[in-house]
């Protein structure tokens, strides 16, 4: 399998950049479209926060991967405790796999283990830059991304990071992660195209909910819709009763109810909603990628609900190859590290001295990776080409495939 990651051609780009797709096609096709959208460890859908540590250890001995001329830092919490460390190791494995599957990569990864610590991430970035890194991949957590971004900006070196907190994105600090704003934009767009104009919403009362609520209000208004009722609820049955009842009372005046929550909580929310007289066969339920969870597929009242997420075909293929190589399942975020490494290897091979320039990285035609189309905006956030799926008792079914290309706006 080749890990060539093609840049999609754009008529607006200089001919050298338009040629990238053709050059990579001759080297071998890269997996496009993919992803399951399970959440980060199926955990609470808040922007990723790092483990608390009392003092900053020096960056761990991450080592190097590859022997190419172009050096790239890879900063991950490999030795962190709990899920953070599991994610860090899996992402390091995926990065190694990307280089192994790429056709003659001219890249060397300088792996820096930050143990989930902000100061260690900063020190690791400084070390990597002193060792000649031309780009930084990672870190995973928002505070560390901010710290690394400051170091990199002073040296005019770009960062491709993995945090889900869009607040840490900026010029030169690009987020490759799954941003909840993309899920919201896609599901509202599809619902509007299906004739849904009036909406209710039940939003979890956590940082993820704050981000999603703002995006939802903005996207509904942009498409000429109306939010009739919206409530925030805590993650306990007693506390959610009042907010759910308030939205249920407005159910006869809405076309759809948006509930962006995970399999840990969504079944209780929907059960409370139906107990208050809402017929979910008459009111369309909408969700985000957090719905990509077998626990949700088994809830009868959610059957027929729509949600936005990457098409899962590519992720399944990636996971199969990962299991064959490492004898264990990858975490969901592993594809981010794979795509980041495949991207820079492709750019090194095709883009010459401009390989990591802002113009190259923000190519409006975007790139195609394990999780489908993506592109970086100038402000550091990203846009992804997502599918819309329908919940069924046998799993999710794609009802609107991801786009084959991006429009001109970015």
Where are the model-predicted features located?
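Hydrophobic helical h-region of N-terminal Sec-dependent signal peptides
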Residues: 24-28
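Extracytosolic ligand-binding ectodomains
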Residues: 2-23, 34-410
């Amino acid at each position: 399998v080749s890990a060539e990651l093609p840049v999609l051609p754009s008529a607006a780009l200089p001919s050298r950049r338009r040629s990238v797709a053709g050059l990579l096609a001759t080297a071998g096709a890269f997996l496009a479209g993919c992803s399951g959208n399970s959440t980060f460890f199926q955990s609470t859908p808040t922007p990723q926060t790092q483990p608390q540590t009392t003092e900053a250890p020096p960056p761990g001995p991450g080592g190097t991967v590859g022997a190419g001329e172009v050096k790239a830092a890879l900063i991950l919490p490999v030795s962190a405790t709990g899920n953070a460390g599991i994610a860090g190791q899996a992402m390091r494995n995926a990065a190694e796999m990307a280089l192994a599957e790429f056709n003659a990569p001219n890249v060397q990864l300088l792996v820096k283990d930050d143990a989930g610590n902000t100061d260690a991430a900063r020190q690791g970035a400084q070390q990597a830059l002193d060792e000649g890194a031309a780009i930084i991949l990672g870190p995973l957590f928002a505070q560390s991304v901010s710290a690394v971004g400051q170091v990199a900006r002073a040296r005019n070196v770009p960062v491709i990071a993995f945090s889900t907190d869009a607040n840490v994105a900026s010029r030169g600090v690009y987020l490759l992660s799954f941003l909840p704003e993309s899920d919201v934009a896609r599901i509202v767009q599809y619902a509007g195209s299906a004739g849904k104009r009036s909406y209710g919403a039940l939003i979890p009362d956590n940082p993820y909910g704050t981000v999603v609520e703002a995006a939802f209000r903005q996207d509904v208004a942009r498409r000429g819709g109306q939010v009739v009722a919206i409530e925030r609820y805590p993650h306990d049955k007693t506390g959610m009763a009042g907010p759910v009842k308030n939205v249920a009372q407005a159910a006869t005046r809405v076309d759809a109810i948006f509930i962006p929550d995970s399999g840990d909580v969504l079944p209780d929310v929907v059960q409370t909603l139906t107990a208050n007289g809402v017929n979910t066969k008459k009111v369309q339920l909408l969700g985000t990628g957090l719905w990509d969870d077998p626990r949700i597929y088994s809830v009868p009242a959610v059957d027929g609900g729509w949600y936005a997420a990457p098409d899962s075909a590519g992720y399944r293929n990636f996971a199969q190859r990962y299991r064959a190589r490492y004898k264990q399942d990858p975490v969901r975020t592993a594809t981010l590290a794979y795509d980041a490494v495949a991207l820079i290897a492709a750019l090194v091979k095709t883009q010459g001295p401009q390989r990591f320039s802002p113009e190259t990285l923000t190519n409006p035609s975007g790139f195609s990776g394990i999780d489908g189309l993506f592109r970086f905006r100038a402000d550091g956030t990203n846009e992804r080409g997502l599918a819309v799926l329908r919940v069924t008792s046998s799993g999710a079914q794609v009802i609107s495939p991801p786009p084959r290309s991006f429009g001109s706006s970015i």
